[in-house]
Amino acid sequence: MSLIDPRAIIDPTAILADSVEVGPWSIIGPGVEIGEGTVVGPHVVLRGPTKIGKHNRIYQFSSVGEDTPDLKYKGEETRLVIGDHNVIREGVTIHRGTVQDRAETTLGDHNLIMAYAHIGHDSVIGNHVILVNNTALAGHVHVDDWAILSGFTLVHQFCHIGAHSFSGMGTAIGKDVPAFVTVFGNPAEARSMNFEGMRRRGFSEEAIHALRRAYKTVYRQGLTIAQALSDLAEPAAQFPEVAVFLQSIQTSTRGIIR
């Protein structure tokens, strides 16, 4: 049976797997579904429609699945979908989507969302992402796998944060961050690539060296984006990692941080 503290309030339409734990004074509203092994701490508010997968842990004072504050929202049915093995620390806020976009906010698997971080409506978070304390994502933000946003990072709506990228503390991001790139400052500027993160994740030295050359092509040779992308076509055919970097620039809709 579910391990539900008697002081918690659970809507009768909520669906909880047998092994779900719910702490005291938490509120789980209608339309919430929680998978096996998930632990909901005390003083958590979950609103639906929200689907939460397996083996997640949600800490006290978090608000997950709340209505978006977007002024265009008029009570339409929208969703939040959370995958498996995520850690959502104290005071995190995650809003559902809007019908003007996908009507869904999505959080993948194995993410760490640290205290007081915010994930805005219609955002899409991949896997193995870390949002450090007080990081705030506006609506419609996409964060790809293995990105790390340090504390107090602010991300403008509709920005795309590339895979394996990194932001320094207090960075204000107003354009897209290409895959692997490290950004710092307010406004954000590209400083280097996340080479330490690549090594920790087992990237080969050949791939890292190829990415280093690709970074210099885009950021250090005074080329236009079109010229740089043309020069990267050959190394992208040799190294999948360079292809990921190249694609993250090609698909940018807001322009990249340079």
Curated annotation (Swiss-Prot):
The keyword 4Fe-4S does not apply. HAMAP family: LpxA (MF_00387). Keywords: Acyltransferase, Cytoplasm, Lipid A biosynthesis, Lipid biosynthesis, Lipid metabolism, Repeat, Transferase. Pathway: Glycolipid biosynthesis; lipid IV(A) biosynthesis; lipid IV(A) from (3R)-3-hydroxytetradecanoyl-[acyl-carrier-protein] and UDP-N-acetyl-alpha-D-glucosamine: step 1/6. Disulfide bonds: none annotated. It comes from the Bacteria. GO terms for biological process: lipid A biosynthetic process. Gene3D superfamilies: Hexapeptide repeat proteins, Udp N-acetylglucosamine O-acyltransferase, C-terminal domain. Belongs to the transferase hexapeptide repeat family. LpxA subfamily. NCBIfam families: lipid_A_lpxA, PRK05289.1. The keyword Mitochondrion does not apply. It is an enzyme of class 2 (transferase). GO terms for molecular function: acyl-[acyl-carrier-protein]-UDP-N-acetylglucosamine O-acyltransferase activity. It is found in: Cytoplasm. This is Acyl-[acyl-carrier-protein]--UDP-N-acetylglucosamine O-acyltransferase. CDD domains: LbH_UDP-GlcNAc_AT (cd03351). It comes from Pseudomonas syringae pv. tomato (strain ATCC BAA-871 / DC3000). One of its GO terms (cellular component) is cytoplasm. It catalyses: a (3R)-hydroxyacyl-[ACP] + UDP-N-acetyl-alpha-D-glucosamine = a UDP-3-O-[(3R)-3-hydroxyacyl]-N-acetyl-alpha-D-glucosamine + holo-[ACP]. Homotrimer. InterPro entries: Acetyltransf_C, Acetyltransf_C_sf, Hexapep, Hexapep_transf_CS, Lipid_A_LpxA, Trimer_LpxA-like_sf. Pfam families: Acetyltransf_11, Hexapep. Its EC number is 2.3.1.129.
